[in-house]
Amino acid sequence: MADTYGMNGHNGHVKDRRSSSMNGRNRLYAQQEPQRTTHLSEFGKHMVAASGEFVGTFLFLYFGYAGNIVAVLQEPISGPNGTLANNTVMYIAMAYGFSLLVNVWTFYRISGGLFNPAVTFGLCLSGQLPWIRALFLFPSQIIAAMCAGGLVNAMFPGSASIANTTLGPNTSIAQGVFLEMFFTAQLVFVVLMLAAEKSRDTFLAPVGIGLALFVALIPGVFVTGGSANPVRSFGCAVGSRDFPGYHWIYWVGPLLGAALAAGYFRLVKMMHYEEANPGQDSPVDV
C-alpha cells in the first residue's frame, strides 16, 4: 500500500514519465487534427451564394413557367366563366411545387435555396439570415426571374403572359392581398420550421417546402393566379411585357405573409415551444 504512488520504489517517476508521454502524445494529436481552411472572404461567400440563388431561381421559375404554359395550351376544355379546369389547376400547382422541391434540394447547400424575396425577408425578420446576405440574394432572385420569363417567352409557343398571375372571377384586390398573404405565410413557416430550425427532419425540408407550395397553389391558381412569390409574378410579366394594374399585390401580400410567419416563429421560440411537446427529436427506437 505504501508503494501505491511510488510505482514500486521509483518514487512516481514512471508515472510522471508516462503522464508526460501521454500529454506530449495528446499535443501531437491536437497538432495533427485537420484545420478547417477558408478559401473565401466574406464578400466571396456572399457572391457564391448569390450565384447559386440566381441559377436556382432561374431553373425553378423556368420549369414552373414552362409547365404552366404547357398545361394551359394543352387543355381544350375550360371551367365555368372561362376559368381553368380542375386538372389544369392541379398540373400548374404540381409544376411549381415540384420544380421548387427539386431545385431547393439541389441548391440549399450553396445559397440556402430560397428563390423567393418573401422567404428571404421572412428569414431575416426571424433572425435566421443576416440582412447583408439578403442584399446579395434579392437582386439575384429578381434578375433570375426576368431571365426565366424572357427565355420562356422566346422559346415556348404562345406567350409568357399565359403564366401571368391574375385575379380570378369575383376576387377583389383586397381579397387578393390577404389571400397571397396567407398562401405565403404557409410557405414561409414551413421553411422556418423544417429548414431554419434544425431537427432530425431537416434533411427532408425540400420535400416539405415543395409540398407547401403545391398545397398553397391548389386554391391559389384559381383565386389569385397562385404566386406566393413576388418574383414568380414579376418574371413572366417582364418576359411578356404585360403587367396587370394590380401587380403590386403580388409584392405586398407575400411580404406581409412572410412577416406574419416570422412573427409567429419568434413567438413560439420565445415561449420555448420545444417543451410543449417534448421528445419529437428523440431516436425512434427510444
Swiss-Prot record:
Outcome of gene disruption: Leads to no variable phenotypes.
Residue intervals passing through the bilayer: 53-73, 88-108, 136-156, 176-196, 203-223, 245-265
Compartments where located: Membrane
Residue numbers covered by motif NPA 2: 229-231
Cellular component terms per the entry's GO annotation: plasma membrane
GO molecular-function terms, A-Z: water channel activity
Extracellular side: 74-87, 157-175, 224-244
Membrane-topology descriptor: Multi-pass membrane protein
Residues in the Cytoplasmic compartment per record: 1-52, 109-135, 197-202, 266-286
Reactions that this protein is recorded to catalyse: H2O(in) = H2O(out)
Disulfide bond residue pairs: none
Residue ranges of the region described as Disordered: 1-34
Domain notes: Aquaporins contain two tandem repeats each containing three membrane-spanning domains and a pore-forming loop with the signature motif Asn-Pro-Ala (NPA). FgAQP3 has NPA/NPV motifs which is in accordance with the fungal aquaporins (NPx and NxA).
Function per UniProt: Probable water channel that may have redundant functions with FgAQP5.
Name of the molecule in the record: Probable aquaporin-3
Gene coding for it: FgAQP3
